[in-house]
């Protein structure tokens, strides 16, 4: 599907190959459209992140993800941006990984996953606009936010604004005339 993101024409692909063979689709499309790998953005599931968490990376290893491993192997590059979307760990070590990542989400995971897709969209918009550092700062977990809050407390300043993935803790107090509904 061709579309425009951040004012740039982009092509969105969902490989129809098995996930472990994602590199076939990605490298063929990149070659056909003459897109260098550092301009290819890959979104994928990550079992090392909690459901709904996201992480942006400029480049890196496959991290044990066979689809990413195949993209790196067939393209010969690991320097493509990626957005990881957490799906959580298997409930038991004996649970089949393919069954786990293809299963549905628990009721309590649905809202965090919806939020993850919104965050992934924002991250992709920043990456396409050429702002991968900004995407990483905005969308990579809460570690940075907690560090900012600790630093602010030491300096006796107000804490930084909440991370985009975190709900405003005092929304009702900040907007007393508005309800959550």
Where in the sequence are the language-model features?
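Nucleotide and nucleotide-moiety/phosphate-recognizing core
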Residues: 1-59, 69-84, 90-96, 117-118, ...
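Short amphipathic alpha-helical coupling segments at ligand-binding clamshell hinges
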Residues: 112-116
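N-terminal, polar/charged subdomain of small-to-medium soluble alpha/beta proteins
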Residues: 179-180
